[in-house]
Amino acid sequence: MPALTSQRLRRWLKPRRGWVIAVPLLWLTLFFLLPFGIVLKISLSEAAIAIPPYSAMVDFGAETLRLVVTFGNYLFLMSDSLYVSAYWGSLKIAFVSTLACLLIGYPMAYAMARAPAHWQLVLLLLVMLPSWTSFLIRVYAWMGILSNNGLINNTLLWLGLIDSPIRMMNTNFAVILGIVYAYLPFMVLPLYANLTRLDNSLLEAASDLGSRSINTFLRVTLPLSKGGIIAGSMLVFIPAVGEYVIPELLGGPDTLMIGKVLWEEFFNNRDWPVASALAMVMLGLLLIPIALFHRYQSRELKE
């Protein structure tokens, strides 16, 4: 009976396969390809005092049709040290934040995967619970904790461990701490999903052969959880590069990230072509780890 039902379902879906594919294709076109094309078009135009504030790429003359394309915005980005520093600062902070998330999240995911079954759901809820509250409220909460009159400084002053408040706000440390706190669940959940699928018989076999716990972890558990590590790192690193809210609220003038520069170019300077070029270069940088991850997944599927 189940086999007959499966055959009927396949016969029903076969002529409708095009419609099934059309739904995600339409979604991808409307919310990725179309915005991508608009941003690319603006990045190849020139700034102008107009609404919108850029020149048209296509100029309709009396008897001619002229296409105006300029790569000056991209050359300007590469020649200005401010934008190069912003890209480098974003990549550096995103990398450190991702590494910190991995160092904190892996032990958490490992402990969750090894916990009794009735505790795993509770631990999962505790990991996801902060994400159910407003992202902005959680960032503002860190402002109250890290400020000169915040919880940490007041506690240290009360204990007599410091004589004056430690400056933690408006620093790269505060930005990294905020990113780690905000994106830690995106590291823990893929790792947990990967670690729960590990074959315990491999660990038992290693133990029977006399392998110590640390050697079993390094030679069996860690290599088999590589997929979860890469997936979690991508989920943290990619949004962290373009993060705007956390650097704006917790960072200072020395915190130069591409998200803040993009905001200033779009809304303060109203230089949409340069801002669009910034976004396109950032997208190009982010496509590199995505392509590497896709290549790794393809190789794993073949093996």
At which residue positions do the language-model features occur?
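Short membrane-interfacial helix/loop motifs at transmembrane-helix boundaries
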Residues: 33-81, 252-253, 303
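Transmembrane alpha-helices
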Residues: 23, 125, 129, 181, ...
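Interhelical loop and adjacent transmembrane-helix boundary motif
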Residues: 11-17, 47, 60, 74, ...
